Amino acid sequence: MVVGDFATKRQLVIIGGGPGGYHAAIRAAQLGLEVTLIEKEKLGGVCLHKGCIPSKSLTQTAANFSGLSHYKQMGISIPEANFEYETFTNYYSSVVTGLQKGVEALIKVNKIEHLTGSASFMSGERIGIDSGHHFEMYEFEHALIATGSNSLLPKQAKLSNRVMTPHTLWELKELPASLVVYGEDYFALEAAMAYKQLGSDVTLIIPADGFSLDSGIEKELLRVLKKNKIKVFKNHQWESAEETADTVAVTLTKDAEEKVSIEASHVLFAAGYSPNVEGLGLEAINVERDENGFIAVNEHSQTSVSNIYAAGDCTIGMKLASKAIKQGKTAAEHMSGLPSAFNLSLVPYVVHTNPPIATVGLTEEQAKSEGYEVKTGQFSMSGNGFASILGQKEGLAKMVIDAKTDVILGIHMMGAGAVDMIQAGTYALEMVAREEDLAYPVYAHPALNEAWLEAIESVSGKAIHVPPARKKEKSTV
């Protein structure tokens, strides 16, 4: 290893080339900063290589495969279809490669210095970079930590080709005959439904009582899981896993007494993450962290050390690429002198199940616990004309509203188009929209978003496609 004799000066040094890191790098370069981006693996991070892109390739493939029966109903004759796992892995790998090349090209065209290696803080103004055969020192005005997180695994379990986490799932070479999924977040739900629809026998273990979604959505989700013949165990905690040549036996406990053993060919543990901060030298800068090691930041993405910022999964809060992107760009703008800030309460949460789930703002339960007097409106997708055309009538749309001010507090949907439509809900909450603001506009017809119109009108009992007996009150209009 060769050690450099001097420190290269940079206005911004970023550690981590995932969504938070590379978005921040490009935004900072756009604003005129000299930027060095350090990534020890491949640009794009977990999201591109082991998370968002592979997982959504999986869920989209499963949705397409399970939807083939509807084509026959529409008069389209299709020979018997088969799912080939190897072809699928080649497909998503090609998608990942294409997107990675795009990120690399963007970094280059924005004249961002990209270094491959491991970085660690020497002080509050210096970072050392070890490339394996060379060590360099950089002196920075600002630094951004965007190192992401890693999937946790219970102490009683060891990673193998049968015991997997969300980050190692993509090493699978064939479709599991049977799969136990342990977890309650979006990844657990997506994997459970996708593998079931592709042909695996799936059991979903939830360590809590639910999925932290609105009660209306949870009820519909459990119905859909049951319809798909996915076995669900609530309030069961992981105790151990014993692997044989062909199977894995998972032992679970409930109420610290009842024990259940479930056997499957494969197990996916998707319950918890730890921040990737080991070896970063955080002790040299003394940034504030929580009890699990996640970095605390303010609304500008600043840590407790004002010239050091952090973004994404290594920070406290949701583990979402959308959060990382917003935090990364906010950090770049703020250190450039702009008054940029973010509000994590308005980050949309999406689950690419079939049908998909999308939500933003407060659930009915959260709103009540925060002291709001709440009124709600709900509409089933079975009453939506375009959903019927698509053959995707499962799901519902729900509005949560402050009864005193008519301000919309939360928008929740499970159904076709939910992920694309939720952005309009984010706009509504950002602008502090009221009930009338969603009820007044003309909605295209036939369209999936008419479910939102029906849901908002059902708040006051004016929904057209809700039978009178189900309306909350009679209209006075």
Regions found by a protein language model. Give the residues of each.
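N-terminal Rossmann-like dinucleotide/flavin-binding domain of flavoprotein oxidoreductases
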Residues: V2-R10, H49-K50, P54-M137, D214-E239, ...
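Flexible, glycine-rich terminal cap/loop adjacent to redox cofactors
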Residues: T8, I15-G20, R27-E41, I53, ...
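Short hydrophobic core segments
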Residues: V13-I15, A119, Y138-G148, Y182, ...
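Glycine-rich FAD pyrophosphate-binding loop
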Residues: A29-L48, S200-F211
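Glycine-rich dinucleotide-binding loop and its adjacent helix/turn
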Residues: C52, I145-I205, K231, E283-I285, ...
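A Rossmann-like FAD-binding core segment of flavoenzymes
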Residues: P79, E113-T116, S120-H133, L198-E299, ...
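Rossmann-like dinucleotide-binding cores of NAD(P)H-dependent redox enzymes
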Residues: S94-Q100, E104, W170-E171, P176-V180, ...
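FAD-site-proximal beta/loop scaffold in flavoenzymes
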Residues: S160-L175, S261-M335
